[in-house]
Amino acid sequence: MSTHLLEQLIDAFRILPGVGQKTAQRMAYHMLEREREGGQRLADVLSRAIEKIGHCTECRDFSETKICAICANSSRDRHQLCVVESPPDRLAIEQATGYRGLYFILQGRLSPLDGIGPHELGLDHLGQRLAAGEVTELIIATNATVEGETTAHYLALLARQHGIRPSRLAQGLPLGGELEYLDRGTLSHAFGTRTEVV
């Protein structure tokens, strides 16, 4: 009996964050022994998601349509634009705060050592949105890491170049912390007490 396909399945599970060799083996064996129907459902949904989910042309969030539901919602405040590093960060803010503005998802943060510069984060597109004149406040909600702070500084400079007031989330964000792991109360307080970037 060939185990080549089983090895491929185990390797495929290892692409998930936090999944090492042992966990991948347990997942593969569990699926084959007890969850074949669930595994088929997972394969079908995963295949459709990879085929149909792209990025919103306005905010760069994941979306099945050209413009996501938040950007298409005419009741959102178009004068406020909140910049986050990732879709989970946007979701955390959306669930924990009463924020009703729009978003821009960087899909990362500035990291010259990793070859991630302004172009990779879509900052040329962000600059065009700021130049359009609709945004009056840029809310910078990057993580409190070295790269996040560097990105925040760059974003503040970009906002000022367009005559837009930049603000930064404050109080409650631990240094080195990631937004998606904060509790709702902490994130809501930090969002409500954001300060202007100096």
Swiss-Prot record:
Q: Which UniProt keywords apply?
A: DNA damage, DNA recombination, DNA repair, Metal-binding, Zinc, Zinc-finger
CDD domains on file: TOPRIM_recR
Q: Which domain of life is it from?
A: Bacteria
Q: Which Gene3D superfamilies did the record assign?
A: 3.40.1360.10, 6.10.250.240, RecR Domain 1
Which Pfam family is one of those matched by this entry? RecR_ZnF
Q: Which residues form the Toprim domain?
A: 79-174
User: Has keyword DNA repair?
Assistant: yes
Q: Does this entry carry the keyword DNA repair?
A: yes
Q: Which residues form a coiled coil?
A: none
Molecular function terms, GO-annotated: DNA binding; zinc ion binding
| Segments forming C4-type zinc fingers | 56-71
Describe the family membership recorded for this protein in Swiss-Prot or TrEMBL: Belongs to the RecR family.
Its job: May play a role in DNA repair. It seems to be involved in an RecBC-independent recombinational process of DNA repair. It may act with RecF and RecO.
What name does UniProt use for this protein?
Recombination protein RecR
What does UniProt list as this organism's lineage?
Bacteria, Pseudomonadati, Pseudomonadota, Gammaproteobacteria, Lysobacterales
